[in-house]
Amino acid sequence: SLAPYILLALALVGLGDTLYLSYFQYLNLIPTCAIGGCEVVLTSAQSKFFGVPLSYIGLVYYVYMFCLAFLLCVEPRSRALRLGALAYTGIGALYSIYAIFYVQLSVLGALCQFCLISALTTWALFGTTIYYVRSNRL
């Protein structure tokens, strides 16, 4: 199955996105945003979790996802890895729904394109994982 390799590629997309945001966060700068809401989102109180920028947490999420996808490339039949990937991407997908639809749209009234890229990547990871798990009949 190509699914583990797709997961690997998607994890790299997420890594690139969060690395870019983390770089700007580290320099205390706001990246240029085509849709105009990045400054509102990235400077809000909700952009940090106990003082840690969410871009850093996203970076860790995608590093771990990359490692998990790599292990799935090596051991594609591992039930534990497939279930772990399903749980991990499911949690990521749920959080991204909360972050985009509740926090950004309802609370802040603004959208960040980089957050949207991360959310779409996370949903694609979850969808690919569901397909992978179902096609391998746990």
Outline where the language-model segments fall.
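Membrane-interfacial helix-loop segments of redox and metal-homeostasis proteins
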Residues: 1-138
